[in-house]
């Protein structure tokens, strides 16, 4: 799953909430464009900027109430502006990985790798 999204990120940007989320994805070898939302602009202005520049994006906000709210708002605005929004990774992590924030992904990934090594 992660390998697939690393490849996908080489041509499609990922939207995250903050700089720490960006750093976490970099630790997981996501080297494509990652766009940080928390820059002091509104969701609608941010969505306008995104829709003017991209035809497809991946959303990876946190998995708490705020992150879920942002995901839903971005999805609504961006799809309404003709942008394809990929939520598969967000939904997969929310359902299968016991974390609440994107920042926790590297540590969780490391734990999973260690489990596999011990088997």
UniProtKB/Swiss-Prot annotation:
Pfam families on file: Toprim
Residues where Mg(2+) 1 binds: 17, 62
Gene3D superfamilies listed in its UniProt record: 3.40.1360.10
A molecular function GO annotation: metal ion binding
InterPro entries listed in its UniProt record: TOPRIM_dom, TOPRIM_RNase_M5-like, UPF0292
Domain of life: Archaea
Cofactors that this protein relies on: Mg(2+)
Binding site for Mg(2+) 2: 62, 64
Segments forming domain Toprim: 11-93
Keyword line: Magnesium, Metal-binding
Cofactor stoichiometry and binding remark: Binds two Mg(2+) per subunit.
Family recorded in the similarity comment: Belongs to the UPF0292 family.
HAMAP family listed in its UniProt record: UPF0292 (MF_01095)
Listed name of the protein: UPF0292 protein TV1259
Organism: Thermoplasma volcanium (strain ATCC 51530 / DSM 4299 / JCM 9571 / NBRC 15438 / GSS1)
Lineage of the species this protein comes from: Archaea, Methanobacteriati, Thermoplasmatota, Thermoplasmata, Thermoplasmatales
